[in-house]
């Protein structure tokens, strides 16, 4: 049986520090999220986090592409190289593949704690339903952003 692994990402935007704090709390309490599933915790954009910037060269969320064949100028962008590294590590064919990635964010929008979903994959709906049932969180389906 394959190991089920979930990637939990905080600090995708370096100026969003609450998710990083939450991940540190999860790590402190060894059994807080253990249900027979292996978790990988990472800071998505560590350099931007260290500097307190949203990003260095480009939005990390917009830096994931199907192909690594970018033009030479954009290849020098930190976030594009970081996105390639993350896919090489945690993508479906990566060295530590994860079946699901949960990207934690903060916002100034008045929407409270919630789940925002992109796309309509069945497994994602199942996970969102599980979280909604367990924590009573509202779920927002975001489909207008073609970049997602």
Please annotate each region the language model reported.
Residues 1-148:
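Structured catalytic-domain cores with a bias toward divalent-metal coordination
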């Amino acid at each position: 049986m394959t190991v089920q692994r979930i990637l939990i990402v905080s600090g995708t935007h370096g100026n969003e520090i609450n998710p990083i704090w939450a991940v540190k709390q999860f790590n402190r309490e060894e059994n807080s999220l253990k249900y027979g599933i292996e978790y990988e915790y990472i800071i998505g954009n560590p350099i931007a986090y260290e500097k307190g910037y949203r990003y260095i060269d480009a939005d990390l969320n917009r830096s994931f592409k199907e192909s690594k064949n970018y033009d030479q100028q954009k290849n020098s962008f930190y976030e594009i190289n970081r996105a390639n590294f993350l896919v090489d590590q945690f993508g479906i064919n990566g060295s530590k593949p994860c079946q699901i990635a949960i990207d934690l964010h903060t916002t100034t929008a008045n929407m409270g704690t919630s789940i925002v979903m992109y796309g309509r994959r069945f497994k994602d709906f199942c996970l969102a339903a599980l979280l909604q049932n367990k924590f009573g969180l509202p779920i927002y389906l975001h489909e207008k952003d073609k970049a997602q």
